């Protein structure tokens, strides 16, 4: 990349103006997106305007369209809803309203519009764009604008960001607000679970989603619900019978509660609505269970945005500004989407079309097609839900094959959800499943027992590791481990854990030369708060830790805002891996995040202090600095604290906080529960296939590299990679992968904290096409 290109980003917006508006229903994380659009816009040299109250503000103009400053978006990252207001607008649907809106934009020289809202809002924006030249002609004819103004504003660029808690927009894996809505729902389900267990009750929970069952579906996976009703997939005609049988079977197996999740738009095969009251009456009448209905309503839109939504909003906001400023009269209006963990640009109308196709397919009762059109992520969730909730657990003892499940390393939230799904999918496939306590140590000592269906009941929402986990590696106990593999007839091993699980896997591979017993398939599921396992972009537990850090930073920032002129230095966990410090820095709006992967010197520390001195002269009189625990052996948290205290004398005072082990605890977030459940199911499916493949002469013999894998999320898919192949990609001394995707997000953190840096624009998303993406072809 040339030096000139490097500097291009800083001057990309000179002479241009961007307006940002939020429209339709509010969603948590919209503020993060607005903040990013404003700050990155200003960084590129553009002028940025807030449009208050959505399209209504665009039509009314005047005070509703105000120029934004760097400081005007301060302290809004952690607020729910939308600070600039949103409104449903009838005027904008009429051409007359759009004419007034065009007039307001032209008069201010605004030719770039960033719309944050649902599919209705984005369709409105596209209509506005397609009529733009006609609207300008009319305004010129009426003498409202001059020919010169019309030429200056000859075309309108539009970029959409999807903000909707329902996740009902096709083309993006997640919309802004969905993850936070899931947080609210799961908090409530966890609270209801305790009261339901006390009274042996059945609860029917109604969640939002008139045309989309995403929230209901993911909630049911995240809390192990007995049944879910979603509009995309109505139940069979005899569902009443099936539901009641399922509820009574669960009770017979010793469960004290039943949970049924209903999307507000749930229907049966004939398109007749299924309401929560209908379900309650059915259960009471047929089974006589004490049943309660809870309608969650607008609680789901409220509260603080989750770390995921803040990062998503920020990334999307940056990408939106780049898309607007790079736009030409020929580029179609696009929407910035998320695919796996990649930001992509898709043509707005293609996405809107597919979204409409889903509704059409549902209206025409083509339900299988509706699920396919919803995309890969939705289909995966549906398949796993069907397996875990609707397949009857086998009654017979002694299965096809014997698979053992264990936890290795430090505890991470979501480990139990992974164990539960692994055990249950294993049982469904007819295997005998064993659980190993205390990691490789327990495997050597024979702390192994058989797990039945109800052994893992209610595990999804529990933090920590119920099996017990140790950091001990297998190398020194290979003999005892081999003996126990034979003794318990273990034919496959699922290892859920952190970097030790991965190195343990490598040691088992090495040990195969010495011990034939180790020639069994094994799979490592990455689970660690540090997110430092090679072969996966995410590991189970990191999202929960991130949210814990975020909540703490919010409270600390609040304290600093009250005291004024105070800088907090916060130490996060993660070993040598800077994932938590970087992502929490992005989500909490930190001024700097020190990490091992990006070496820093005393000069860098000095620059940061000078930066904070400048900041104290503005209206924002507080600072937040994150430091990864092992980022530098000499520049410790105490050293940085002392340096800041000395250099900031008379200007600001400093405080330090070491967050410590609270980052490993807590109830798992919806993301970690869902991710763990899917990973467990995927791993067990792979395992069953591998065992069959390795069956020779009456026994299992697996000695090929692909019989020992790490299951990881890579960009857009879950993939199995042999541990031996990942060896070259690993820095063993510092226990981190050599290449890490999230390092590309570091510049965003710095720009949003007002550092004058070069932004490499070569890595920005390119326009792709939604239909091609579906069929799995490469991006255009």
Curated annotation (Swiss-Prot):
Region described as C-terminal regulatory PFK domain 2: spans on this chain: 402-780
Regulation: Allosterically activated by ADP, AMP, or fructose 2,6-bisphosphate, and allosterically inhibited by ATP or citrate.
Record-linked CDD domains: Eukaryotic_PFK
Binding site for ATP: 25, 88-89, 118-121
Pathways per UniProt: Carbohydrate degradation; glycolysis; D-glyceraldehyde 3-phosphate and glycerone phosphate from D-glucose: step 3/4
Active site feature: 166 (proton acceptor)
Catalytic reaction list: beta-D-fructose 6-phosphate + ATP = beta-D-fructose 1,6-bisphosphate + ADP + H(+)
Residue sites binding Mg(2+) per the record: 119
NCBIfam families documented for this protein: 6PF1K_euk (TIGR02478)
Name used for this protein in its record: ATP-dependent 6-phosphofructokinase, muscle type
Species of origin: Mus musculus (Mouse)
Organism taxonomic ancestry: Eukaryota, Metazoa, Chordata, Craniata, Vertebrata
């Amino acid at each position: 990349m040339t030096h000139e290109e490097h500097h291009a980003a800083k001057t990309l917006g000179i002479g241009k103006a961007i307006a940002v508006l939020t429209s339709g229903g509010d969603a948590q994380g919209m503020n993060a997106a607005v903040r990013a659009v404003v700050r990155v816009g200003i960084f590129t040299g553009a002028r940025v305007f807030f449009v208050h109250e959505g399209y209504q503000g665009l039509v009314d103009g005047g005070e509703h369209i105000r120029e934004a400053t760097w400081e005007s978006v301060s302290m809004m990252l952690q607020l729910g809803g939308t600070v600039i207001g949103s409104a449903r607008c009838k005027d904008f649907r009429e051409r007359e309203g759009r004419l007034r809106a065009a007039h307001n934009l032209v008069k201010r020289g605004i030719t770039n519009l960033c719309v944050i809202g649902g599919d209705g809002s984005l369709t409105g924006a596209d209509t506005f764009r397609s009529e733009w030249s006609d609207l300008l002609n009319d305004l010129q004819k009426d003498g409202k604008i001059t020919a010169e103004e019309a030429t200056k504003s000859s075309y309108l660029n539009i970029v959409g960001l999807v903000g909707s808690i329902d996740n009902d927009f096709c083309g993006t894996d997640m919309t802004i607000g969905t993850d936070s809505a899931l947080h609210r729902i799961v908090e409530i389900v966890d609270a209801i679970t305790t009261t339901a267990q006390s009274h042996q009750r059945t609860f029917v929970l109604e969640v939002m989603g008139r045309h989309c069952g995403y929230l209901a579906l993911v909630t049911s996976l995240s809390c192990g619900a007995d049944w879910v009703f979603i509009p995309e997939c109505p139940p069979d005609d005899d569902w009443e019978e099936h539901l009641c049988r399922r509820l009574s079977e669960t009770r017979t197996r010793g469960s004290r509660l039943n949970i049924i999740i209903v999307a507000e738009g749930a229907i049966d095969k004939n398109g007749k609505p299924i309401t929560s009251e209908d379900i309650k009456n059915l259960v009471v009448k047929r089974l006589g269970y004490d049943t309660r209905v809870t309608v969650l309503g607008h609680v789901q839109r409220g509260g603080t945005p989750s770390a995921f939504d803040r990062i998503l909003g920020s990334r999307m906001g940056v990408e939106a500004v780049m898309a607007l400023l790079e736009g030409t009269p020929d580029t179609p209006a696009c929407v910035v989407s998320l695919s796996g963990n990649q930001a992509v640009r898709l043509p707005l109308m293609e996405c809107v079309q597919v979204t409409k196709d889903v509704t059409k397919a549902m209206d025409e009762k083509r339900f299988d097609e509706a699920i396919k059109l919803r995309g890969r992520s939705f289909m995966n969730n549906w398949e796993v839900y069907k397996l875990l909730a609707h397949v009857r657990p086998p009654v017979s003892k002694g299965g096809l094959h014997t698979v053992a499940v264990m936890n290795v390393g430090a505890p991470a939230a979501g480990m139990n959800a992974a164990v539960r799904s692994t055990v249950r999918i294993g049982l469904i496939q007819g295997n005998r499943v064993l659980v190993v306590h205390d990691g490789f140590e327990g495997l050597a000592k024979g702390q192994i027992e058989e797990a039945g269906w109800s052994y893992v009941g209610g595990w999804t929402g529990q933090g920590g590791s119920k099996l017990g986990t140790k950091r001990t590696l297998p190398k020194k106990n290979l003999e005892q481990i081999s003996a126990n593999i034979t003794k318990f007839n273990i034919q496959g091993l699922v290892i859920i854990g952190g970097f030790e699980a991965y190195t343990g896997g490598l040691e088992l591979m090495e040990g195969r030369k010495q011990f034939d017993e180790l020639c069994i398939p094994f799979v490592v599921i990455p689970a660690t708060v540090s997110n430092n396992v090679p072969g996966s972009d995410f590991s189970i537990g990191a999202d929960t830790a991130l949210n814990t850090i975020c909540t703490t930073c919010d409270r600390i920032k609040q304290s600093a805002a009250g005291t004024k002129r105070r800088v907090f230095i916060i130490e996060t966990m993660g070993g040598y891996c800077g994932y938590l410090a970087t992502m929490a820095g992005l989500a909490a709006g930190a001024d700097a995040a020190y990490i091992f992967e990006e070496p820093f010197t005393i000069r860098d520390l000095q620059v940061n202090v000078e930066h904070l001195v400048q900041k104290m002269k503005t209206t924002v009189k507080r600072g937040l600095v994150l430091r990864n625990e092992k980022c530098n052996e000499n520049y410790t948290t105490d050293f940085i604290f002392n340096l800041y205290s000395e250099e900031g004398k008379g200007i600001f005072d400093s405080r330090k906080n070491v967050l410590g082990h609270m980052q490993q605890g807590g109830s798992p977030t919806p993301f970690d529960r869902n991710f763990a459940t899917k990973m467990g199911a995927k791993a067990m499916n792979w395992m069953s296939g591998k065992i069959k493949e390795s069956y020779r002469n009456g026994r299992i013999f697996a000695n090929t590299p692909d019989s020992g894998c790490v299951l990881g999320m890579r960009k857009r898919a879950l993939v199995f990679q042999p541990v031996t192949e990942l060896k070259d990609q690993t820095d063993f001394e510092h226990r981190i992968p050599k290449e890490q995707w999230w390092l590309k997000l570091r510049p965003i953190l710095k720009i949003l904290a007002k550092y004058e840096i070069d932004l490499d624009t070569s890595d920005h998303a390119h326009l792709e096409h939604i239909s091609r993406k579906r069929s799995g072809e490469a991006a255009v």
